[in-house]
Each structure stands twice: as structure tokens, then as C-alpha cells.
Amino acid sequence: MAAPRISFSPSDILFGVLDRLFKDNATGKVLASRVAVVILLFMMAIVWYRGDSFFEYYKQSKYETYSEIIEKERNARFESVALEQLQIVHISSEADFSAVYSFRPKNLNYFVDIIAYEGKLPSTISEKSLGGYPVDKTMDEYTVHLNGRHYYSNSKFAFLPTKKPTPEINYMYSCPYFNLDNIYAGTITMYWYRNDHISNDRLESICSQAARILGRAK
């Protein structure tokens, strides 16, 4: 005849352990050590019961931290490349003011920031407010850039972070750059306060080269 099978539920085991630990009414350090054992057992039980969830949460948090680090490094590298290319553009174009604009959030383009500039800021722009300007996607410059074409004007300056007229600007020339997702990500723009500037063919060559390099870094 087979022996009867005895089963224990988790609650039976728990109360059995508690009974063993506290049945002698111990006090002081002995009691404290036993309470510590109970807490440890409780934590081990939670880890055992929900181990997969804890491990998944740990992996997710590590991945998010790693992604944030990579994103910060990429942004820092892009800003360095942007400044380097802008210096070349500014000198080669003989512009009075040049800027690299970057859109955010990534691939959505709701706001625009000046992330680097060379030359003298227009009188209507403050160095303290170079970022967070809303993007008007109906403007000619934006729609022209979406098609990969360069833009120039002597009266419309879509991305300058100001609503005030800027009469000292007589001419501007800009070209778009596209990120690694092939999404319009920002512009390189040159401005002149005087009437004379080098030919658009030359500006196209200067701007296109910088835009390709920025696109690979973005």
C-alpha cells in the first residue's frame, strides 16, 4: 500500500518557519537577528516568485541607461562636427553671420535650435534665446528644403528665433541636411548685412559639402 502523499502550501511553510523562529519568545539581539532572517527570506521569496519580472526590469533599465549615454555622445559629436563645418562655411562664404539649425524632437521637427553660429548676431536675436523656436512648416524655406533644394532670399528668414523684422539682413542662403534616417533634420544658413556676396553656384558647393558631413554625423 502506497504511503499517503503529503503536500505543503507556501503558507504552511511560512508559518512553520515563523513558529520555529519565535516560539521561545526570544528578545533583544536574538529577536532582531530572527526578524532579519524573516525579512531576508521574504525578499528571497519575492525574487524567486517574480524573478523573470525583476530580470526584465533590470535589462530594460540597463538598456535605457546605455541608450541615453549613446545619445549624449552622439549629440556631443554632432555639435562638434557642426561647429567645425560652420567655421569652414563661414570663412569660405564670406558671410557676416552663419548658423547651424537643428530640429527637435527627432524626425518630428516641432522646434528649431541654433546649435552653433559664427559672426555677429542680428540685432533682433539674443544669445540667451537661441533655442526652442517653433517651426512653421508652411514657410517657403521649409518646403523647399524638404525636397532637398537650397533656398535663398533677401526678405524671408524662416528660422531666425525672432518675430521682429531684421532689416539689417540683405541676403541669406541656406541648404538642408538630412539625418541617417533620411529625414530633414536642420539647415546650414548664411546671412549678409551688406549687399554683395559670392555667387550662388559657389555657395551651393560650400553648403552642400558641409550638409553631407553633418548628415552623416546626425
UniProtKB/Swiss-Prot annotation:
GO terms for biological process: viral release from host cell by cytolysis. It is a single-pass type II membrane protein. Residues 50-218 are periplasmic. Residues 1-34 are cytoplasmic. GO terms for molecular function: pore-forming activity. Keywords: Cytolysis, Disulfide bond, Host cell inner membrane, Host cell lysis by virus, Host cell membrane, Host membrane, Membrane, Signal-anchor, Transmembrane, Transmembrane helix, Viral release from host cell. Disulfide bond is required for functionality. The keyword Hydrolase does not apply. It holds the Pfam family Phage_holin_T. Disulfide bonds join 175-207. It comes from the Viruses. The keyword rRNA-binding does not apply. It is found in: Host cell inner membrane. The chain crosses the membrane at residues 35-49. One of its GO terms (cellular component) is membrane. Belongs to the T4likevirus holin family. Accumulates harmlessly in the cytoplasmic membrane until it reaches a critical concentration that triggers the formation of micron-scale pores (holes) causing host cell membrane disruption and endolysin escape into the periplasmic space. Determines the precise timing of host cell lysis. Regulated by specific antiholins that somehow sense superinfections and then delay lysis. Participates with the endolysin and spanin proteins in the sequential events which lead to the programmed host cell lysis releasing the mature viral particles from the host cell. Homomultimer. Heterotetramer composed of 2 holin and 2 antiholin. The holin-antiholin complex binds dsDNA. Interacts (via C-terminus) with antiholin (via C-terminus); this interaction blocks the holin homomultimerization and delays host cell lysis. Interacts (via N-terminus) with the lysis inhibition accessory protein rIII; this interaction stabilizes the holin-antiholin complex thereby resulting in a robust block of the hole formation. This is Holin.
